[in-house]
Amino acid sequence: MGNQTSQRPLSQRQLRVGELVKQNLGELFIRNEAKIPFINSKLITVTEVRMTPDLKTARVYVIPLGGADTKETVRILTEYSHLVRKALSKRLDIKFLP
């Protein structure tokens, strides 16, 4: 059958919510509101956010400034994703926080 979700174009709502999440994550990292240990979140750039059709899951693409230690940065962000979600929930007023 294959992966049909990647072939379907994103809806306007998915794009709009994805951009909202991207913008707020960028501001959150600049202001270090998530208080993530071991990394300087001011040096993280959010390049893209892809939302699932039900808007309950987001895939966030980030890159550290200069591209150094990308794997380590992603590992730390994944480990402390609960802090990022908590800080993001204070900024966004949507039904389901991805």
Q: Could you tell me what each predicted segment is?
A:
Residues M1-T57, I63-P98:
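Charge-rich, low-complexity N-terminal segments
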